[in-house]
């Protein structure tokens, strides 16, 4: 069977997408219950950004690992220079982007008339939520890539949909934990 047959792609994708729908419904329910009492507009603005950035970082790493597995430059085990460099690049990119966006949140908070301390707390909440999310991104993507490849599934059909769903849930939970702890919502 060809790696890129329509039948294989559909057979592997539909169950994965169904699982993603269930995870997405769980994430939505978690957010709905948790955000009901939160009055902070800035914290609510952080949710789609954290989900989007986290998902994008996961997609980048997932695509790179999927290609590396297909090309044979990465073996499905937790060693090797190519895997290590990809993980390091993902972590450094994550730190950079979450730090940059937290500065933007700080500026927005100050422009909205929020005091310096509260603006700093919001920026800190975003960067910490991103740092809590980063290991989830790396572990979920690497695990999904290796497991799907070992099971004979195409990582391109499995990793990104499931990883982004997991990342959405983890992003919401990490932001809620940090926002409640740091911002005091």
Where do the PLM segments sit?
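Juxtamembrane boundary at the C-terminal end of a transmembrane helix
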Residues: 172-185
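Interfacial loop-to-transmembrane junctions
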Residues: 147-168
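Alpha-helical transmembrane segments and their membrane-interface boundaries
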Residues: 1-115, 119-123, 127, 131, ...
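A cytosolic-side transmembrane-helix exit/cap motif
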Residues: 60-68, 139-143, 177-180
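Short hydrophobic "helix-edge" motifs at membrane interfaces and signal-peptide entry regions
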Residues: 44-46, 142-145, 157-158
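Short alpha-helical linear motifs
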Residues: 70-71, 108-109, 144-148, 182-185
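Transmembrane alpha-helical segments of integral membrane proteins
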Residues: 136-150
């Amino acid at each position: 069977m060809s790696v890129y047959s329509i039948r294989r792609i559909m057979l592997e994708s539909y169950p994965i997408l169904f699982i993603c729908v269930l995870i997405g419904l769980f994430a939505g329910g978690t957010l709905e219950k948790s955000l009901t009492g939160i009055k902070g507009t800035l914290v609510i603005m952080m949710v789609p950004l954290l989900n989007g950035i986290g998902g994008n970082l996961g997609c980048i790493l997932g695509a790179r690992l999927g290609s590396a597995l297909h090309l044979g430059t990465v073996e499905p085990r937790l060693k090797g220079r190519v895997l290590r460099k990809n993980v390091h690049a993902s972590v450094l990119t994550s730190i950079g982007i979450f730090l940059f966006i937290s500065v933007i949140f700080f500026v927005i908070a100050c422009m909205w008339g929020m005091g310096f301390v509260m603006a700093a707390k919001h920026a800190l909440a975003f960067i910490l939520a991103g740092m809590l999310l980063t290991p989830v991104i790396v572990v979920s993507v690497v695990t999904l890539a290796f497991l799907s490849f070992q099971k004979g599934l195409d990582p391109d059909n499995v990793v990104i949909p499931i990883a982004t769903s997991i990342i959405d849930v983890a992003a919401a939970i990490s932001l809620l934990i940090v926002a409640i702890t740091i911002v005091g919502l």
